[in-house]
Amino acid sequence: MSALLRSSLRFKHMSAVNRLTQQLRLLTASAPLSAANTAGKAPFKVAVVGSGNWGTTVAKIVAENCTAHPELFEPEVRVWVREEKVNGKNLTDIFNAEHENVRYLPKIKLPHNLIAEPDLLKAVEGANIIVFNLPHQFLAGVCKQLKGHVNPKARAISCLKGLDVTPQGVYLLSDVIENETGLHCGVLSGANLATEIALEKYSETTVAYNRPKDFFGEGDVTNDVLKALFHRPYFHVRCVQDVAGVSIGGALKNVVALCAGFVEGKNWGDNAKAAIMRRGMLEMINFSKRFFPETDINTLTVESAGVADLITSCAGGRNFKVGRAFGKESGSGKTIQDVEKELLNGQSAQGVITCNEVHELLKNKNMQKDFPLFESTWGIIHGELKIDDLPEILYHAN
């Protein structure tokens, strides 16, 4: 890369941060000194809820940027860690003493300003940016605990990949957070294999955030603030406004990745996997049009949160690995849950949960025939179909 291009890219990112810094200086100079300003504190305090493989990776990024931008962020970042024992010791004690999440992100050193906190309410105390990053089956319980205990002017970002499906319909997880806690919520999603990012290998992500109705002007969270919070030299951020599109891409690609894993496990080759990915993208777009018509289809076909996430998830993500192992064990009597336990060190493949939820939604709406790949994936998981049935089913798809 030429020196001129490096300079241009650096300027593009830094201009947003510099613009923020200048705005905050003007705000501080023109407004009466608040207690925070008098104490010399930065305007944003950040907390992370969730400390699995991906949660810890994002917390690492956030902590690095809180150190890099002291004019914007308070240096200490608390991450909520569900307490458990590791070799007889509390995980949080090991985390804070060794600066490593030995359970879910071993051998990755974490910033010293990242503090593990087992008490959820203490972890988010005083925070005005809260990053949610935990398995989505635990989200409702966490939101109930937080309700009434967070600053109503705080903002949230969801890094979860899934949907909330009820008999009444389907909802974005960012909407669940907003409805349950009152926090205006955006999303972060993309072609983001956690281990690669933790090792600081180059990747991209997409952040979707819309200005809240109660936006209070200078000092509130904006896309520039979020870019400063998440962008790293190895983790490049693109900001868009399509919260629905980014959310759907992150959720449904997990179902497609399971199915791609099935055919990989059967050794059908790359052509077969590409066919699954193509059909999967079509059904992701169809799903978006049916249930979230506000989605910008370009998000799925252009952004990291769409096609790029689908590609990487079907090449090496945990859902793909679970699907591949299940495909190899086809006919052995092992369930998908057995495979999860063997492969994921106590964590879950979100695609299995999402697949079940999408099936229930399509069944309730009498739309099963319109989504043959999603439905076939569900049927294979539950033993109602064989992987060998896939080519014939997809051949007759619209």
Curated annotation (Swiss-Prot):
UniProt-recorded name of the protein: Glycerol-3-phosphate dehydrogenase [NAD(+)] 1
Record's GO cellular component terms: cytosol; nucleus
Pfam families xrefs: NAD_Gly3P_dh_C (PF07479), NAD_Gly3P_dh_N (PF01210)
Residues bound to substrate: 161, 318-319
PANTHER family assigned: GLYCEROL-3-PHOSPHATE DEHYDROGENASE, GLYCEROL-3-PHOSPHATE DEHYDROGENASE [NAD(+)]-RELATED
Catalytic-site annotation from UniProt: 253
EC number, as in UniProt: 1.1.1.8
InterPro entries (UniProt xref): 6-PGluconate_DH-like_C_sf, 6PGD_dom2, G3P_DH_NAD-dep, G3P_DH_NAD-dep_C, G3P_DH_NAD-dep_euk, G3P_DH_NAD-dep_N, NAD(P)-bd_dom_sf
Binding sites annotated in the UniProt record for NAD(+): 50-55, 138, 161, 194, 318, 350
Primary localisation category: cytoplasm
GO biological process, one term: carbohydrate metabolic process
GO-annotated molecular function: glycerol-3-phosphate dehydrogenase (NAD+) activity; NAD binding; protein homodimerization activity
Keywords: Cytoplasm, NAD, Oxidoreductase
Family under the similarity heading: Belongs to the NAD-dependent glycerol-3-phosphate dehydrogenase family.
